[in-house]
């Protein structure tokens, strides 16, 4: 009888603890809404530490550009694997907490659509949110950024991958990358897992062109990096998809490796704790890590300059529009420099190709560009556009046993249009 009583007391204490832990405090009358459950699929090879597989396209990095690239490659018919070191897809939009991506429009019309827009639109609609009116030119550029529910977005991205036949490998990252006669051998490591992947094409969407660096191809880097941002909410409840949250600059934030990323996160969290104590407010929400703006960029077959960007140059091999002010963040803050009315920059396919390379393409903020051009190109909608183009180019190259830059541009453009993307055209 005594043992039974102790067990009941322990159970009650545990439930009470759970009630108090939901927002870090006790709330009168709070209960757990339901105790529903699901069962994860039992993996046949779960006890095997080593996995060997062959795919057409390996996407490294499931962030803003990477998950779009993977979905596109899968939809194009390529056998696709995406490797992501974190626990979810979406990158800046989800893990980074910048759940107000942009810009999909310019000067009264939509200029970036496709898979990225499909995900953003569905996440807003599923959350009962409101989409901006792109026919209206806002006074400030950020007014047409789209508020999304970051949690819904991450789940929808996984669903789209599953529907496209894309395999996801979380908590893994390449350890070695070796060139082969018909592509690459990539050895990835995760906890309890060693995965050897034979692939025809690699899409490097790591943000800092980590795979490009691993294979010895040239990268560009500034002595001073733009600060990262750590997002959090003090004093009032954060409503995903409804409001913006507080931002803390983490100067020197560097995503180059686990040590530099750890330092950025420790620095950011320490500063947030100091702010909580100073303001005597409750910490209601905090993202799991710093959002990084700048590390490495590739040296590509084309380098997009700030003059290319601000003049709205339409490259002969343009595969996506981009639209955002020149937006360089420094220790003194940021002063966006808006583009002249009617100007819409473009992104060239050759700016996604590391110089002198074959069978590898990048997507995202590591696009080949000078620093000022990159400060506008690195934003989410543009990265999604790059991701979709990289997915098309890599999958078509794999199918033809070719390399992305040798795929006929009309084929890339046709496939992009087929999947809803807006392809730049010359006036």
Q: Residue locations for each model-derived region?
A:
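N-terminal Rossmann-fold NAD(P) dinucleotide-binding loop
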Residues: 66
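Conserved beta-strand-loop-beta-strand element in the redox core of flavoprotein oxidoreductases
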Residues: 178-196
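Beta1/beta-strand and adjacent pyrophosphate-binding region of the FAD-binding site
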Residues: 51-63
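A short, basic/flexible loop-to-alpha-helix module at the beginning of a structural domain
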Residues: 41-54
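Flavin (FAD/FMN)-binding glycine-rich loop and adjacent Rossmann-like elements that form
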Residues: 92-93, 154, 171, 190-201, ...
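N-terminal export leaders
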Residues: 14-31
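N-terminal secretory signal peptides
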Residues: 1-16, 39
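Conserved N-terminal/central alpha/beta ligand/cofactor-binding core
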Residues: 22, 72, 78-79, 85-176, ...
């Amino acid at each position: 009888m005594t043992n039974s009583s102790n067990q009941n007391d322990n159970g009650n204490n545990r439930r009470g603890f759970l009630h108090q832990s939901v927002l870090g405090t006790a709330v009168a009358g709070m209960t757990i809404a339901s105790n529903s459950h699901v069962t994860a699929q039992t993996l046949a090879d779960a006890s095997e530490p080593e996995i060997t597989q062959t795919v057409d396209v390996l996407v490294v990095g499931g962030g803003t550009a990477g998950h779009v690239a993977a979905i596109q490659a899968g939809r194009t018919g390529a056998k696709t694997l995406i490797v992501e070191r974190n626990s979810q897809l979406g990158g800046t939009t989800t893990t980074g907490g910048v759940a107000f991506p942009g810009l999909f429009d310019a000067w009264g019309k939509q200029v970036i659509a496709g898979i990225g827009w499909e995900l953003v639109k569905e996440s807003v609609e599923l959350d009962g949110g409101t989409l901006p009116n792109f026919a209206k030119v806002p006074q400030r550029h950020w007014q047409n950024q789209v508020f999304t529910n970051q949690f819904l977005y991450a789940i929808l991205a996984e669903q789209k991958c599953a529907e496209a036949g894309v395999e996801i490998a979380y908590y893994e990252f390449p350890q070695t990358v070796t060139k082969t006669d018909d592509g690459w051998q990539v050895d990835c490591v995760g906890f309890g897992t060693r995965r050897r992947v034979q692939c025809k094409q690699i899409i490097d969407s790591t943000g800092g062109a980590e795979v490009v660096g691993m294979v010895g191809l040239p990268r560009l880097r500034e002595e001073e990096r733009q600060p990262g941002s750590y997002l959090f909410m003090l004093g009032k409840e954060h409503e995903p998809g409804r409001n913006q949250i507080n931002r803390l600059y983490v100067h020197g934030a560097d995503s180059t490796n686990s040590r530099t990323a750890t330092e950025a996160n420790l620095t950011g969290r320490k500063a947030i704790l100091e702010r909580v104590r100073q303001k005597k407010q409750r910490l209601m929400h905090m993202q799991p890590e710093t959002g990084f703006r700048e590390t490495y960029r590739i040296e590509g077959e084309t380098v997009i300059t700030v003059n290319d960007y601000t003049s709205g140059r339409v490259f002969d091999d343009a595969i996506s529009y981009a639209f955002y002010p020149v937006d360089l963040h420094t220790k003194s803050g940021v002063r966006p420099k808006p583009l002249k009315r009617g100007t819409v920059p473009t992104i060239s396919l050759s700016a996604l190709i590391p110089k002198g390379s074959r069978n590898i393409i990048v997507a995202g903020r590591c696009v080949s560009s000078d620093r000022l051009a990159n400060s506008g190109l690195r934003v989410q909608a543009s990265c999604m556009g790059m991701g979709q183009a990289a997915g098309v180019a890599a999958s078509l190259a794999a199918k033809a046993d070719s390399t992305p830059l040798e795929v006929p541009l009309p084929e890339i453009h046709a496939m992009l249009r087929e999947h809803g993307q807006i392809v730049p055209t010359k006036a």
